[in-house]
Amino acid sequence: MPEISRFYGIVIRLYYRDHPPAHFHAIYGEHEALVEIETGTVNRGWIPKTALELVNQWRMIHLQELREDWSRARQQMPILPITPLD
């Protein structure tokens, strides 16, 4: 599962050919959440509230890039890294 970004101890990953809806995996320590790209909703798992707020700030800034990477991953094309949250 390629890592597409890392910031404040949070790792963002995408799986190739993963199931809909479009989402990414946010890992913080021992916690992991599946976060919908379009809405920021956590579909499965859990990460602390502060980490989730940072993830959603980053998600909103990079929404189009996330959509494009999701499409690439579904087609098994190379996934591009995304700039971390400053």
Language-model segments: residues:
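Basic nucleic-acid-binding interfaces
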Residues: 1-86
